Amino acid sequence: MIRLTPTLLSFAILLFSIVKVSAQDTLGNIFDGPYLLYKGNQILVKEVTHSSKKVIATEKTYTLSEKQKLAIKVNFSDAPEKNFEVKLRSSLQNEPSVWAQPDKLLFLSDIEGEFDALRNLLLANKVINKKYEWIFGKGHLVICGDLFDRGKDVPATLWLLYKLEKAAKLKGGYVHTILGNHDIMNLAGNLKYLDQKYLSAAEAMGQSYMELYDENTELGRWLRSKNLIEKIGDNLCLHGGISPEINDLRLTVEQINTISKPYIGWKDLKNTVKDDKILKIFNSTLGLFWFRGYFKEPVLEETIVDQTLAQYQVKRIIVGHTITKTNVGFYYGGKILGIDVNQHEGQHEGALFEKGNWYKVDLTGNKKPIKVN
């Protein structure tokens, strides 16, 4: 029989604690939510607050009259210091499509539920502080699509952007959230890339996954207020790109967003919609959030890129969606800026426009001039 001395006992307890913490770190954030659903004159706030072998869900009910006083609490099982609260809006408005040129812009894309990547990039590049306060002044943060699917913290990512929108406005800045293919897929029920965590959590909460983001939810309404494309100063910003077929529609940025909004979240659009413009905009090869022609063979001819720049009266097109070894980088002599990097594999970078210059930025806060490939 082994007798533990006080010293050995203390060491054993310490070792057990380290193993327990390490296991928790490996799991990441096992919480999910919160999700805010509207049901009649009630507000339901649902979340998964604990999960090991069994998922345990909680639900709180409020009246609509309590909405303005309600604070949504976003909690993290693996790192409580990341917790934050969100005040709800009295109403949600569709985003404008065209903006004047800000003095400072930070572009990110394809976060896909990697909350830590988003948070750490914003901290390192002095967009927020650790209290989630906006410190980017009159600068604009632009997310070029894809908030959903592979990562473990999609709701937290959405709520953070929701929160920062108001914080930025109070300081003269702005947050632009542009939808990508993964966002459109989730809202329309195409869940082929969805992490199992979210399906298990939805089941535990007694909801279908689709009910967590439909028109009767706060996040669902918020997402449906977002654009597919925006013109910000000299920049045309979207997720995938502009194909020749989209150019041929001869639509303005405002027109694209206006006619597309009713179809965000539309199921089986290909077989139920006859409008040729809508079918092209949402096309899974040539559409705004799917097109890869700037990077994949056969690459688009530069004359087509020039046509797009002239048609929308911009100097460059900024896109995510397609990962290349040379991103964050310029292409076509600086006419295309590709910003998609592999967030899931630890490549966390973005593009910063400041004082008339373009920089690649990372988690250290370092700035390097963006190369032309």
Q: Model-derived features: where do they sit?
A:
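Bacterial Sec-dependent N-terminal signal peptides
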Residues: M1-T26
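Feature recognizes metal-dependent phosphohydrolase scaffolds
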Residues: Q24-N373
